[in-house]
UniProtKB/Swiss-Prot annotation:
Keyword Electron transport: yes
Protein's name according to its UniProt entry: Reaction center protein H chain
Modified residues (N-formylmethionine): 1
Cytoplasmic-side positions: 31-258
Localization in the cell: Cellular chromatophore membrane
GO molecular function: bacteriochlorophyll binding; electron transporter, transferring electrons within the cyclic electron transport pathway of photosynthesis activity
Quaternary context: Heterotrimer composed of subunits L, M, and H.
UniProt keyword annotations, A-Z: Bacteriochlorophyll, Chlorophyll, Chromophore, Electron transport, Formylation, Membrane, Photosynthesis, Reaction center, Transmembrane, Transmembrane helix, Transport
Reported cofactor(s): a bacteriochlorophyll; a bacteriopheophytin; Fe cation; Mg(2+)
Protein source organism: Blastochloris viridis (Rhodopseudomonas viridis)
Cofactor remark: Binds 4 bacteriochlorophylls per trimer. Binds 2 bacteriopheophytins per trimer.
Biological process, per Gene Ontology: photosynthesis, light reaction
InterPro entries in alphabetical order: Bac_photo_RC_H_C (IPR014747), Photo_RC_H (IPR005652), Photo_RC_H_N (IPR015810), Photo_RC_H_N_sf (IPR037097), PRC-brl_dom (IPR027275), PRC_barrel-like_sf (IPR011033)
Amino acid sequence: MYHGALAQHLDIAQLVWYAQWLVIWTVVLLYLRREDRREGYPLVEPLGLVKLAPEDGQVYELPYPKTFVLPHGGTVTVPRRRPETRELKLAQTDGFEGAPLQPTGNPLVDAVGPASYAERAEVVDATVDGKAKIVPLRVATDFSIAEGDVDPRGLPVVAADGVEAGTVTDLWVDRSEHYFRYLELSVAGSARTALIPLGFCDVKKDKIVVTSILSEQFANVPRLQSRDQITLREEDKVSAYYAGGLLYATPERAESLL
């Protein structure tokens, strides 16, 4: 063996090389795992236990608070030290920590389970030039439906129970992505309108089929503060309502398949 070798095919330089990469990737992994806890943390357990970093120090699980400057003004600091203030209308099915949670009211309206949403800012998402990002076609007049595609305006919306829930009156377009995000619905038997995320729509030539919720549940779709704009939180609330319907629209959906 030559000088510095520990074995026939292993020497100190090779060990140092391996150790160097082990240290580098360990540090990177620990840093990334701590940084990804800036959203969704601190954890709140069903019985109300909250894990917060100490004021004068730091625990391994949570990073120090960091302030980010937003592109269109304002700042946000995460992780935030204030606990969740919303009342969760859920009850444990048993008396031990970790037992399943069951809705105690209307889970779609109460925003629990798959119908839950993050409390994002009540501000309108903006394009790079500061315009409202998601708006109806009546506002974004420079956008149109591609030639040959179905124009859903005027088509009926049929819900999961086979009942007509209303009529499509407009489409909402993402100005940045050049993609339609929502259909605007005039709810049957009501003076109000509601948005439907396009991902929950089966667009046919003569109708729009929405299987996630029942016709009567369109009346409780979260309302918007503005007729022509939607905030970040409202985006989540609307999508969460339809997502929750996949499990909670009927009692049978929440039961097991077997």
